Swiss-Prot record:
Ion transport among keywords: yes
GO molecular-function terms, A-Z: ATP binding; proton-transporting ATP synthase activity, rotational mechanism
Keyword field contains Transport: yes
Lineage: Bacteria, Pseudomonadati, Myxococcota, Myxococcia, Myxococcales
Protein name: ATP synthase epsilon chain
Length: 132
């Protein structure tokens, strides 16, 4: 028996697969889910979501969202989700640099500071997952 992992973004169902384990970046820290885990729901930070299938790890960059666990099913509702091998590193690096430059020009009191900070975290997550 295995966990069912579903990753869904506003655009599409990214993935639906049977897995042995899921590790995700929660807003209160990283956590793991295995078979027969207690039900819960949490918000996700931008970061690396890893799942283990047949002893092999697979990595996704998620741009925040929510994760729910119930009845051996893990549902990830992510703002964005990209497999490590699908990330355009040059584009991710440019997005990171652009967001960082915009953030440096803002103060914490600026209305767009929070959104720009989130863009930096999403771009950094993409670069990390891509291995760059």
């Amino acid at each position: 028996m295995a966990l069912t992992l579903d990753i869904v973004t506003p655009e599409k169902r990214v993935l639906s697969v049977q897995v042995d384990e899921v590790r995700a970046p929660g807003v209160q820290g990283g956590f793991g889910v295995r078979l027969n885990h207690e039900p819960f729901m949490t918000a996700l930070e931008p970061g690396r979501l890893t799942y283990v299938e047949g002893g092999r790890e697979h990595h996704y960059a998620v741009g925040g969202g929510f994760l729910q666990v119930a009845d051996n099913r893990v549902i990830v509702l992510a703002d964005t989700a990209e497999a490590a091998g699908e990330i355009d590193v040059d584009r991710a690096r440019k997005a990171f640099e652009d967001a960082q430059n915009r953030l440096l020009q803002l103060t914490e009191q600026d209305e767009s500071h929070s959104a720009e900070s989130a863009r930096v975290r999403r771009a950094a997550a993409r670069l990390t997952v891509a291995g760059r």
